[in-house]
Amino acid sequence: MDKLVIQGGVPLRGAIAVSGSKNAALPILMASILAEEPITYTNVPRLRDIFTTNKLLAILGCPAEFDGHTVTVTPCDLKPEAPYDLVKTMRASVLCLGPLLARLGEARVALPGGCAIGARPVDLHLTALEKMGATFDLDSGYIQGRCKKLRGAHIHFDFPTVGGTENLLMAATLAEGETILENVAREPEVVDLANFLIACGAKIEGHGSSVIKVQGVPRLGGCEYRIMPDRIEAGTFMVAAGITGGDLLLTDCPFEELEAVIAKLRDMGLIIEREGTRDVRVTHNGHLRARDVTTRPFPGFPTDMQAQIMALMTIASGAGVVEETIFENRFMHVPELVRMGADVKLSGHSAMVRGVQKLIGAPVMASDLRASASLVLAGLAAQGETHVQRIYHLDRGYERIEEKLNAVGARITRMPE
């Protein structure tokens, strides 16, 4: 198991290319199950979760070939079972449930794993699929689903679940008749999935709004599709510029998809400007101010940026409250930031952050993907040396993060623990 050793206190200057989006690529790759022809994906990030997804697709009968940042999937003899040894490492693997039911009328999927950040129930997925005609049993840790043929239905989500929206959107493309999904997730990654499905021949309207309408079609074909850039990686690098007092140009950077993050970072003192159509420059005016942050479904402030902006707030002037409304137990980075000298007090789903003059390097342990990123950011700003342990979480969601940061001045070494 590796760790990162970070020598802090170096302003970052230069250009960083934003990778393709992990959170868009995972469901889009799973949607390969729906297609009857080969598909070529470009701008695919080389991440542990992507490699796991490709292994899972191969087991399900959709072998995937990785070449650089291009993945070609060739559907052949589909099989209905997603085994535990792959699913246990990645919660997104439950997204094969809807496509398998739509194509085969059956699915046997192990209960998912992934980051340990509280309850992420799949009940919303199952309840909605039942309305389309599926039945489910829990058998030795596996979800066993069956249906004769999925039928279009009118489905209202109690909460705009991203995974539930994606699963039902995929299932509905091959269902009989029209499916109306209400109170759906509006995240850009959901829109990217819908655009991909449309490119394969699906009939979808309303993606990006709270109501999506899907008219089922008999089959989906193949296409070539470019995965959107990763807005969370881009936001993380924006914070890296601010927390080190640096000057970064982020190339192929999403902007509209990051409006809530950019607005909050500007309010804290960062200068964020577009350069051309797809590049963004990030600096700051020398004075960081703490601000209140509340996570919300898109277009609100994303929960996946909560830990990173908290790291920035630890060295800002004043105090701010970070409120987490999406996931429970998503403050596991707080004790580690406190080890580095941060002043953070927890109270239920909120954290009071009071800025300190400096952070001090220390050994810290990553507990989930975004917590890992916050500790790397804190290490970049800290005085002295920081050891971030258990970085396998980081490798699930950030492509070569230490190489990208070192290229703009950071001093980070990967080594065995």
From Swiss-Prot:
Q: Check the record and name the InterPro entries matching this protein.
A: Enolpyruvate_Tfrase_dom, Enolpyruvate_Tfrase_sf, MurA_subfamily, RNA3'P_cycl/enolpyr_Trfase_a/b, UDP_GlcNAc_COvinyl_MurA
Q: What is its EC number?
A: 2.5.1.7
* Catalytic residues, chain numbering: 115 (proton donor)
Residues recorded with modification 2-(S-cysteinyl)pyruvic acid O-phosphothioketal: 115
Summarize where phosphoenolpyruvate binds, as residue positions: 22-23
**What is the reaction catalyzed?**
phosphoenolpyruvate + UDP-N-acetyl-alpha-D-glucosamine = UDP-N-acetyl-3-O-(1-carboxyvinyl)-alpha-D-glucosamine + phosphate
One Gene Ontology biological process = UDP-N-acetylgalactosamine biosynthetic process
Q: Which GO terms describe its cellular component?
A: cytoplasm
Q: Which Pfam families match?
A: EPSP_synthase (PF00275)
Q: Where found, per UniProt?
A: Cytoplasm
**Keywords, sorted A to Z:** Cell cycle, Cell division, Cell shape, Cell wall biogenesis/degradation, Cytoplasm, Peptidoglycan synthesis, Pyruvate, Transferase
GO: which molecular function terms? UDP-N-acetylglucosamine 1-carboxyvinyltransferase activity
Q: Which pathway does this polypeptide act in?
A: Cell wall biogenesis; peptidoglycan biosynthesis
What family does the database annotate?
A: Belongs to the EPSP synthase family. MurA subfamily.
Function, as annotated: Cell wall formation. Adds enolpyruvyl to UDP-N-acetylglucosamine.
Name of this chain's protein: UDP-N-acetylglucosamine 1-carboxyvinyltransferase
